[in-house]
Amino acid sequence: MLAIISPAKTLDFETKIDGFVFSQPELTAYSQQLIDICKQFSPAEVASLMSISDKLASLNVARFAEWTMEHNEQNAKAALFAFKGDVYTGLEAETLTNAEIDYAQRHLRMLSGLYGLLKPLDLMQPYRLEMGTKLANPKGKDLYHFWDNIITQHLQQAIDAQEDNILVNLASDEYFGAVQAERLTAKIVKPVFLDEKNGKYKVISFYAKKARGMMVRFMLQTQPTSIEQLKAFNYGGYWFDETASTDTELVFKREEQ
């Protein structure tokens, strides 16, 4: 069983991580092509392209300039520990055991606008390049055109290494859009997390993102081998709703917080 998640805009490159054998990202030749395009932009152009502040734009212009194909422990950090958004708050990578991290290396992948697809212990350098960015490139008008079937091919290889051909989609629509799902030989299931608000259950973004991270944590700690076992997820007070679920969507609900 393989899970996929989105990356995060918030990064932590201050905290050092030791005790692991880090891996190299596999698609840096493609990353370099994107960096070469991004290096041509002024801070004002980056601010406009990414809809970010001038301060953030300047930071990312500097990041593009400093990015290098060589990834080592001095200039990079393992992706699982570098990302710090809501999903990763729910995942709590720092409190996982080494055995759980080792399992994650085989059963978890992170989608990325710059790196395409990352394993948890892949070294990455600080960047900001969301998958939805309309970055014109030789292959087309945006990153979906750029990555085309590359991410899908590498994802299939990771799925083929599993014993059950199950892909658990915990990524956002923006990032899963870079996967050509119809080309995958896999049973794809998407957990959906609904929180009660004023008596009605609905997706509340902050809670849903955190729940995706909690589901990854659940998978790393219980090592499920069937969709049935995924339904036992109960972290954070969520429970599986059989009636609201389908073959491809697993619905989990939680009472108002």
Swiss-Prot record:
Disulfide bonds: none annotated. It comes from the Bacteria. One of its GO terms (cellular component) is cytosol. Signal peptide: none annotated. Pfam families: H2O2_YaaD. GO terms for biological process: response to hydroperoxide. Transmembrane segments: none annotated. NCBIfam families: PRK02101.1-1, PRK02101.1-3. Belongs to the UPF0246 family. This is UPF0246 protein HAPS_0280.
